[in-house]
Amino acid sequence: MTTYKTLFLTRRAPVHQKMALEAAPEILKIIMLRDANKESILEHIKDADFLITEREDPIDREILEAAGRLKLITRLGSRVWDIDLDTARELEIPVCRLPLNSCIHVAEHIIMQMLTLARRVRECMNVMNTREWDKEPRLCTEDLFAYNWSGRTGMRLLWNSTVGILGFGEIGNELAIRLKAFGCQVSYNKRNPLPRKAEVSLGITYQDKETLLKDNDFVISLLPFIPGTEKLVNDDFFNSMRRGSFFVHSGGSGVVQEESVIRALTNGQLAGCALDTFSWEPVRDDEPILEPSRNFKVNLVLTPHVAAGGTDIQKANPRTVYYENIVRLIEGRPLTHQVV
């Protein structure tokens, strides 16, 4: 059986690497490199048949010219600005992108979290369930109705809000695209700023962390759980934010200090908070964060680590899709999402 050397560049944790490897077809000999430096890439690319990349450092002319056998580049995600497309075109190396279903799910979940906080949806739902109003019902007509009959206050718009995103990867990319439709002014912070052309394309601007925290109506955390981020979102973090702003976290588990969330909501530093991941999962029965969530007047939205979709979604979008275009090329079938 003919096998093909496939270089897989990633920044993901070992558990995700293992799942990606298990999904690979037998005909592929996968060399997976995490956070590889350029020298290592140049060494392995020389005899590679295929390249799969989800890293953000450039796949530049030097790397492409060193790839004497390369037949295809697959970029996991929607972004391709980290690949020298002109050189790929010149060397006749096809490039395909692969929009990740899971990242799109998370981006939509975050929009839901933001709207739920801004419109105080939990409080409004509780009003309906508990009949918290003192007006007598009347049959509505064209001219007779009772707008806001329960007297809700504090509802805000997502439209034209300032939004700061911490940890800008594929999810941040998908989120920024969707926030455009709400007229939001989006800034971001990450270890290595994006190329200027990427910022212009997405309509986003880079901010240092301190400025991002204090200048935005919404702070969205997509930070992964890696060395240096454990409990990074704590009292100091929230006290650095604009008073009365919103905080949303759909990043890695273990990044947020939940007790700090409670304090920030109690003292009014936060107008609302939404969390999808937690320090303990499943959440322990006596976890302090559960207590304020039982009070519907506290603007706290908790979801059980489902931003990427349910088990049915995961089964419908297996990791074998990472290798789909490689198999298509080997079998002589048309490629999908081809950009070069």
Language-model segments: residues:
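Rossmann-like dinucleotide-binding domain for NAD(H)/NADP(H)
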Residues: 244, 250-340
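Phosphate-binding beta-alpha-beta segment of Rossmann-like dinucleotide-binding domains, i.e.
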Residues: 99-162
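Hydrophobic Val/Ile/Leu positions in short beta-strands of Rossmann-like dinucleotide-binding domains
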Residues: 8-9, 163-165
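Rossmann-like adenosine-cofactor binding region
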Residues: 46, 58-64, 191-288
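Hydrophobic/small residue at the entry helix of a nucleotide-binding pocket
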Residues: 171
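N-terminal glycine-/charge-rich "phosphate-binding" loop or analogous flexible N-terminal tail
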Residues: 1-48, 187
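Oxidoreductase and adenylate-handling cofactor-binding alpha/beta cores
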Residues: 107-126, 177-184, 321-333
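Short beta->alpha connector loops at strand-helix junctions that form conserved
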Residues: 34, 76-77, 93-104, 251
